[in-house]
Amino acid sequence: MIIQGGMGAGVSNWRLAQAVSKTGQLGVVSGTALDTIFSRRLQLGDPGGHMQRAMGHFPDADMVDRILARYYRPANGSGQRPFKTPPMISLDTDQHTKELTVLANFAEVFLAKEGHENPVGTNLLEKVQLPNLYALYGAMLAGVDYVIMGAGIPREIPGVLDLLATHREVSLKIAVGALNGNRFYATFDPKAFLQKTLPPLKRPIFLSIVSSVLLATMMAKKANGKVDGFVVELPEAGGHNAPPRGKLVLNDLGEPVYGDRDTIELEKIKALGLPFWLAGCWGTPEKLQEAISLGAEGIQIGTALAFSKESGFTDAIKKLTIENIHKGTASVFTDPSASPTGFPFKVLSLEGSLSEDETYQERPRMCDLGYLRHLYEKSDGKVGYRCPAEPASVFVAKGGNADDIQ
């Protein structure tokens, strides 16, 4: 089986996932930032009526009405006013934000599954923890078949899926820069949230994205529930990469150098007895056969599908990138500091985009989305939020490291 990579935000959209799943492979939606994406689709008049069609199948019509009343704008005149941005999600987020996140993920998975009987997955980031309980529940209400997670160690997610499958209350330890070893948790009670007849749910298959035998072993043996398999990502994979093991060394271009310690011994992955897929420059028929010969179930493909007609990239981005590839001028840089997650990140050089330092420096510094804010415990015991996108003076005044905003 080929897994379509989960590329956020909005690149791996429902159209791409549906198209892939209709071929018999695993289409995957990205659950990252779906509350914002969903609300903007509604404010653009919901072209094609797809969001409202999906919402018509949600089990709580009152909840749907509340979201539509707040965000939907008729198509005529849409786009003339600034977008109404949803509230930033927080540790004790309000009911509206929960409803929006659940509905957004429900709609994306519902549409990806529409018109066929094949499985569909959702991809979430461990580094973007705060929305994940609500995102998972929304996806499960729509019948999601696979949950794929990386960008961290999602050790608690298998147990969360077990509980959500029976609408039981769940909690998730949240990474907070805490004083005196204090711990902080996000909680979610589906029964209190929905307060309707609860539909039967299935527990989706959980695949952990790993970059080492050590991490795969930890997930297989120490997760709080069943891990069903792995996506084994090599450093060549697109998007976020695991940092090299040991002291960070950069090459002449400023990219992280991966060494022998970063080589993944596939025989040891295989010995764990769980199915696995290979990712990171495996996207050819020949590499697929090689992966299978090494014991893999198949491969995960991202980049090639990112430039398909169904992906969420704009046509202009697709056209310019493909032209650059044909001219031999396309380049990808593994940037050790581009992502607020702290993980290396693949950056495609594209004229007029934030890949150019001049364009990046001209962008006003503001924190308007907040998905990658750093949580920390304040002296009064409450949780504060540092945002690498906010003005540098504000970030540093909250105790942030100036290097984290470059």
Language model segments and positions:
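Conserved active-site-proximal phosphate/metal-binding subdomains
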Residues: 3, 227, 235-275, 283-286, ...
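Hydrophobic residues within well-ordered alpha-helices
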Residues: 20, 291-292
